[in-house]
Regions:
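Alpha-helical scaffold domains
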Residues: 1-270
C-alpha cells in the first residue's frame, strides 16, 4: 500500500549481502507468505512520523492510488485493503500510526480492534507494544477491559498481544494477580498457530517454523512475562509458580529466561 515509499529506504546491504539478509529474515521469522522488505525499526518509526504529519499517496489496489492528507486517512486506508497484500513493514507502520494519532482512548481502541487481528508475527506484535507509550497514561481499567477478548482468543498473536501489553503497562502489584489469573485459565492447546514445530534451526529463513511446541510465541510470551515479574515482584511470582496450572515446558522456558537475565540469574525461581 505504501511500498513505493518504503522500497527506496531498504539498505543496499540487505539487497546484496545474502548472509546479512538471511540473518535479518531469521530474526523477524515472518510467515512464508509475508514479504519482508528489510527495513529496521528506526527507519519505520521515522516514516510513520512523516506520514502522520503529512499523509501519503497510497495504493489501494493495482492502479488505484489515493492521496491521504494525514495519518488518520492512511490508517483508514490500511483498514480497507486485504491483509495478505501488506508486507511486514507496512503492518508495523500501520501500528505506529495508530500510536501517533491524537485522539481519544475510545477512538484509538476502535483503531486497534481492526489492527490486532492482522498481527501474525512476534516482531510486529512486540514492536507495536513497545511503541504504544500512550498506554502508560491511559485509563487502566478501560484498557484492561479492552484486553479481555484477546486473553481469551484462540489466535496466537492476539493472545501474545494481550500478554506483552500486560507485561509492559500493567506490571504492578495491583494488576499482577489479575494477569496470573489469566495465565492459569489460558487453554493453551486450543490456541491456533500458523507456525509448525521443528527442532533445530531451519536451513533457510522464513519457513514458517518455530523451535518449540505450538503456540510457541504464546508460551514464550508467558515465560518472558514471568521472568520480568520475578525481577520486580519475586515473592508474588514464586508463589504463583508453585501453584500454577501452566504446562511444564512453559515453566522451563520461564526458568531459562530468568537465568539468561542479569537481573534474575542469581534469584530463586521457585
Amino acid at each position: 500500500m505504501i511500498r513505493s515509499i518504503l522500497t527506496p529506504l531498504v539498505s543496499p546491504r540487505f539487497l546484496t549481502d545474502i548472509r546479512y539478509r538471511e540473518g535479518h529474515l531469521r530474526v523477524v521469522n515472518a510467515l512464508p507468505q509475508r514479504r519482508v522488505l528489510g527495513l529496521h525499526v528506526p527507519e519505520m518509526q521515522q516514516t510513520a512520523k512523516q506520514i502522520s504529519r503529512c499523509g501519503a499517496e497510497v495504493e489501494l489496489s493495482e492502479g488505484n492510488r489515493k492521496k491521504c492528507h494525514n495519518g488518520e486517512e492512511v490508517i483508514r486506508s490500511f483498514e480497507t485493503v486485504p491483509n495478505d497484500s501488506l508486507c511486514h513493514e507496512e503492518i508495523v507502520i500501520w501500528g505506529y500510526l495508530i500510536n501517533l494519532e491524537k485522539c481519544t482512548l475510545p477512538e484509538r481502541l476502535t483503531m486497534l480492534e481492526k489492527y490486532v487481528p492482522v498481527l501474525d508475527n512476534w516482531a510486529v506484535c512486540d514492536s507495536y507494544c513497545a511503541n504504544a507509550k500512550w498506554m502508560a497514561h491511559a485509563n487502566k481499567h478501560e484498557l484492561w477491559a479492552f484486553l479481555q477478548p484477546y486473553f481469551r482468543s484462540t489466535r496466537e498473536f492476539e493472545v501474545r498481544f494481550a500478554i506483552v501489553i500486560a507485561m509492559t503497562y500493567f506490571m504492578t502489584e495491583e494488576w499482577l494477580p489479575k494477569i496470573f489469573e489469566h495465565f492459569n485459565t489460558l487453554n493453551i492447546p486450543r490456541i491456533h498457530s500458523a507456525y509448525r514445530y521443528e527442532k533445530g534451526k531451519p536451513n533457510l529463513p522464513q519457513q514458517g517454523t518455530a523451535q518449540g511446541p505450538q503456540p510457541y510465541y504464546v508460551r514464550m510470551a508467558i515465560a518472558w512475562h514471568l521472568a520480568t515479574a520475578l525481577a520486580k515482584y519475586p515473592a508474588l511470582t514464586r508463589a504463583f509458580i508453585r501453584t500454577t496450572f501452566l504446562p511444564e515446558d512453559v515453566i522451563k522456558l520461564y526458568i531459562r529466561k530468568a537465568r539468561e537475565s542479569f537481573r534474575t540469574r542469581e534469584v530463586a525461581v521457585m
